[in-house]
């Protein structure tokens, strides 16, 4: 991977015809990862639970170029069958319930997917001798509300609320399969992903962009002071592939965790202002101050990934936002009523 290039490169010889299982392929990162794997000529298998027509992997036509297995990440028999029948070499585990609000309302289903799904996949991989690399997508939320910033990989995993706890547990389960059984696992912990293809309008970036395109003031559910680092989705997809390549060449990486981040701290209000500025609008956000059970301040130290993997993100926040905004402009232009030159008007999207 060329860390200074705008578009990360991959080892085509490594990926060509390689059987790769992607869980969570209909999600934001999963869709872009599948696109990158197809470009690298991998033989991609996607485990899909729900049929979501608006998912980027489906809208782009990429789903027609992969092997699709309808199944649930919590179905261990299904997982073992997929790993065996397709002779999977590399596993990219992205399947998860990722919405904090849903986790607070329905913790059991979140625990089943994020914790149960992880150990069932790890156990299926343990019983599948052809699996050579497993990349498990954890999250910065796995650290909980740690007081020492930035978070390093040595920061204890101490989630407090349902979503955070589910990521802490899944992370530790992946590590224990590496440490106890020698399973070839690495864990990634990323900041808040963003990019084209995210149609969850309750998220801060897509919700704000949609509001501006509709001529509406974006709504911030919190007081705007929450601080995060934001990680562009194409950087994430490239980093997962780069990590798998490194694991193949360096077995000593098994069991390691890596923070992936731009290491730039941005408050919600600063982020919204950056989007408004980039879109050239005079609209102002409506700040509701309603959000609860969310961590006030998080950002990651990615020096381990830089030093161990020779990795760094290709997209600055400005560059990523520019690319993302253009994607949404194209999306709404393609999906507006052809008999109406204006975009549909609705309520302003509430953002985190």
Predicted regions and their residues:
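C-terminal substrate-binding subdomain of Rossmann-fold SDR/epimerase-dehydratase oxidoreductases
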Residues: 1-5, 39-42, 212-352
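N-terminal Rossmann/SDR dinucleotide-binding element
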Residues: 1-90
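Conserved sequence/active-site signature of Rossmann-fold short-chain dehydrogenase/reductase
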Residues: 74, 98, 142, 186, ...
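N-terminal Rossmann-like NAD(P) cofactor-binding module of classical short-chain dehydrogenase/reductase
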Residues: 89-92, 135
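Catalytic helix-loop patch of NAD(P)-dependent Rossmann-fold dehydrogenases
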Residues: 105-120, 127, 133, 142-187, ...
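Hydrophobic alpha-helix immediately C-terminal to the catalytic Tyr-X-X-X-Lys motif of short-chain
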Residues: 169, 173, 177, 208, ...
């Amino acid at each position: 991977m060329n860390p200074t290039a705008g578009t990360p490169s991959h080892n085509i010889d490594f990926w060509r015809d390689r059987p790769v299982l992607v869980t969570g392929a209909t999600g934001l990162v999963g869709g872009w990862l599948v696109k990158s794997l197809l470009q690298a000529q991998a033989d991609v298998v996607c485990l899909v639970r729900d049929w979501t027509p608006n998912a980027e992997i489906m809208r782009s036509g990429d789903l027609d170029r992969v092997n699709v297995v309808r199944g649930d990440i919590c179905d261990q028999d299904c997982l073992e069958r997929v790993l065996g029948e397709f002779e999977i070499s590399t596993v990219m585990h992205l399947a998860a319930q990722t919405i904090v609000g849903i986790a607070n309302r329905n913790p059991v289903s979140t625990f089943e997917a994020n914790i149960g799904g992880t150990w069932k996949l790890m156990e299926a991989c343990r019983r599948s001798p052809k699996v050579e690399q497993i990349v498990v997508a954890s999250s910065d939320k796995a650290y909980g509300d740690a007081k020492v910033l930035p978070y390093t990989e040595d920061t204890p995993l101490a989630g407090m609320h349902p979503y955070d706890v589910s990521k802490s547990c899944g992370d530790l389960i992946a590590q224990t399969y590496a440490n106890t059984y020698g399973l070839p696992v690495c864990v990634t912990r990323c900041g808040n992903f963003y990019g084209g293809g995210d149609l969850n309008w309750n998220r801060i970036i897509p919700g704000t962009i949609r509001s501006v395109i509709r001529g509406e003031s974006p709504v911030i559910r919190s007081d705007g002071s929450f601080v995060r680092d934001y990680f562009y989705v194409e950087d994430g997809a490239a980093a997962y592939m780069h990590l798998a390549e490194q694991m193949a060449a360096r077995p000593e990486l098994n069991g390691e965790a890596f923070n992936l981040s731009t290491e730039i701290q941005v408050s919600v209000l600063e982020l919204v202002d950056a989007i408004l500025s980039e879109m050239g609008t005079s609209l102002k956000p409506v700040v509701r101050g309603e959000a609860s059970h969310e961590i006030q301040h998080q950002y990651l130290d990615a020096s381990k990934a830089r030093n161990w993997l020779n990795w760094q993100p290709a997209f600055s926040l400005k560059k990523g936002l520019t690319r993302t905004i253009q994607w949404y402009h194209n999306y709404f232009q393609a999906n507006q009523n052809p008999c109406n030159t204006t975009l549909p008007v609705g309520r302003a999207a509430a953002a985190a």
